[in-house]
Amino acid sequence: MLKKGLALTPVKFGISFTSSFLNQAGALLHVYTDGSIHLNHGGTEMGQGLNTKVAQVVAEVFQVDIARIQISPANTGKVPNTSPTAASSGADLNGKAAKEAAQTIKQRLVEFAARHWQVGEEDVQFRNGQVRIRDRYLSFEELIQAAYVGQVSLSSTGFYRTPKIYYDRAQARGRPFYYYAFGMACAEVLVDTLTGEYRLLRADILHDVGASLNPAIDIGQVEGGFVQGMGWLTSEELVWDDQGRLLTTGPASYKIPTVADVPADLRVKLVENRRNPEDTVFHSKAVGEPPFMLGIAVWCAIKDAVASLADYRLQPAIDAPATPERVFWGVEQMKKLHQDVGRVQPAGQGQGATPNGGLHPPYESGSHA
């Protein structure tokens, strides 16, 4: 017998290192006379798109194509004392540091152009790879070459530290996070009550990333985070032997999600027209870890499907990860409960009534649907 389950779960995720001293980042930026730009920052690119986002920040400041920008891997000989790329803060911290370095050089260029061509600083505008100086138009590299001849420094460091964060653990007071990221996921599952096997049929996700630096990257991060969270709560089970040795040491025994576990119908939308009210890099929000928690929707949907066997009176105690074996035993719990309720239900008691006599764990009250 097949049963469907549906669950809607939200997430509110604080963004910042809780060790406040880690909320800092540096950058080193060089602009060359051919108009190319070389950037070093303290973040580590792991495939999450960090370098692309930080390069976009610099490109936006100078109003040039991102192809001009080359980023070197993190190197403490260039940017020392780097914080970990963690806590979903990579783009926030390093993007801000890179932006400061770029703005420093840009301001030097504006001051030079105003002085050299005898115009006001407000008459110097960077647009679409060109620089307008009142009625004169120069390419970006032409301005750079002129500034070099004019002995203007074309290198700068940038530094950023997250403001407003403080926390007194003894008093349990303060502001541990700079801001929060929000999201919501709705999952629909199909459970085989004979075997405990299940399949995620569809997932709908709405996530808040502020003013997205790169929607394609952010949507990809939401998709990946959700699938990773789904694995955490459904299949990734750690098993130790009697001596405390870990037995699930590889993919043969520790099951991570595969492409076959991703629902054929996976819909991700980013919240539109909602800038981060805090002064983050172009008012964007972090997207690394928050979507991971949205995988909870799958676990709750599985419990909802199993709860239907007892008319949703109670929720089965299916621990995470909800492996097929645990789901099977959850099904057996609900079947037994349903039979017990049928035997003890007084005559005339409505179908919607909830018997409360003699019920003990592994049954839980409540519904996730």
Stretch-by-stretch model annotation:
Residues 341-345, 349, 357-358:
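Intrinsic, low-complexity polybasic segments
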Residues 1-341, 356, 363-369:
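Cofactor-binding beta-sheet edge motifs in enzyme active sites
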